[in-house]
Amino acid sequence: YANEVAANYVGRKHPNIECRKELHTFLKRMYDAVLSAKYGRNQYDSMRANRESLPKDPFVFSCFHDYFEDYGTTQFLMNELKTACPEADTRFISFYDMKIDDEGIPLEDGSHATLLYRLHPMELLIDEQTPDNEPLGEMFLDLYEDDTFALFNPPESIILQNKSFMSLVYALYLTDQFYTKPDRDIIERYLAPSYFENDFSALDDGLYIQKEIWGREGRHVQVVQKRGDTSELYMEKLVDNYDDIVCRDSKKVMYQDFIQQKRFTHTVDCGVKDGFLTLSCFMLGDQASAVGCRFSPEEIAGTEAYFVPLLIE
């Protein structure tokens, strides 16, 4: 969305021009899949074909409303679902106000959520408790397992949130037995060599990035110099808003080869700065879609990074 706004402002084309349509198609497919699972494919198709009024099926979007980055993302996706599916009953609830009962997630009008989009790390949710010390996370997952509601981003997403997943992917790549040739080509090109903590002592001397496996927003990211059986700090990410970054506490780390980046000069709100670009790609299921770019004066990017529009000459 932001890329499109910037491109329109300067009268240029941009690489994400078809990606909004891709997002709408994905959201429509998800919407139909959730309701088909609830009512059965034949009944749902019949209701749509006969233009019957569908029962109230609230699709709830939720985050902590005072965390503005998450709030903006949540509102954007909720509005895009409404654009893709005008008939959808979309609602926003702050995590501060969300409750659960024996039937799922109750809403103010007496109904219950059919689907929930939550912008809150699953690795935190699973251990959270109520003020009475009841296992809120466990109860939430039990309700999900009982099909009282569907999840836009299901518990399986916790696998990708754990940074040691990259170590697993790379370890399997090294066996030369698990992936197809196209898969291996992708891993070799796009994934920096990644290692489990226990493998660090066997690595060659040199510079490595050390990351907490549950870290977020650059917190506790370091570059270390390995020399034999010892290592010393070479560079560390200092996060200004350390206490505001919500992530699971963990002492476990993983390592990646430190790859020197190209430097770029970029004009920002406070003048001209030298720094580094980070390119990202949004995935819709297994389909690559929109691309994005950030600029940071620091080699280890965090919340200080600037949004950079991508335009086509």
Indicate residue ranges for each PLM-predicted region.
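Domain-scale recognition of functional cores that engage charged ligands
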Residues: 2-313
